[in-house]
Amino acid sequence: MKIETGQGTIPLITLLGIWSISALNALPGLAVSPILGQMSTIFPHSSEFDIQLLSSLPSLLTIPFILLSGKLTERINNIVLLQVGLIIFALSGLLYMLSSRMWQLIAVSALLGIGSGMIVPLSTGLISRHFIGRYRTRQFGLSSAITNITLVTATVLTGYLAEINWHLPFIVYFFPVVSFFLSFYLKRDTISVAPVKVTVSGKIEVKRLVSLMLFYGLVTYLAVIVSFNLPFLMKEYHFDTGASGIIISLFYLAIMAPGFILNRVLSIFGSFTKCVSLLCMAGGMVLILLSGNELILSLIHISEPTRL
């Protein structure tokens, strides 16, 4: 089966490889999210800072390694760099399973952030390389949806696995093994992809670029603080890790939905799309503060996020 790209076609297996890389963007810090509220019980001598560091360190280290990865692509083959990142990612999953102390978990979280940082820019780069025009826009929307489908599925899974043993949620970090094998098809197909000549007129609008970066940073921050702090809120409401996992997954399920109809959403709201997104998120957060019921929290998290 061949997939239309706007500049030819690619095999379905190549597209699956690209999608599998997009799915990995959701994983860093995910496994510990449902059990953050229990970490003080598992490790009674750990401070609140240690627990927060465990969940935020992967994202923190992802940032500099995204920049480094972008620079390395100028000298190193993209697919080779991707495979190195996947190996580091999967290795961190194995080390998580073997860790029994908080400092070990924190150290492995740093390693996870390094692997994730090497992968993230390449996941979007692969879409940009293979697709153009409306096909590219559609794939970016699907990529976002796939990322959040992974979040939904993995969060529910980790929530229930945490009730069996706190080590088991880290199984989700072995998913890069699948992407590693699919990356060989990417390597084979990349050779045949012809570069696209793009004519750019005028200069880059720096102010617009900065405003988009700030907006994306704000929306990402608002989404992250919900997923990171919800387990502690659930603990205060005396809910178990399974319920925490379900509600976090509903949050990402709602984020996922617009990705399937991104072009349609943009055509309806136009320049007001970002305003609508922020209003939905603000309304959801206000309702979270006012609610202590599990069912109501679930409904709030379905209606809250509209990250486009």
Residue ranges and their predicted role:
Residues 14, 19-45, 226-231:
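Extracytoplasmic
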Residues 45, 77, 98-103, 291-293:
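Helix-breaking motifs and short loop linkers at transmembrane-helix boundaries and internal kinks
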Residues 110-146:
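Cytoplasmic helix-loop-helix junction between adjacent transmembrane helices
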Residues 209-248:
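Extracytoplasmic gate region of multi-pass secondary transporters
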Residues 300-308:
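Residue-level detector of conserved catalytic or cofactor/ligand-binding positions
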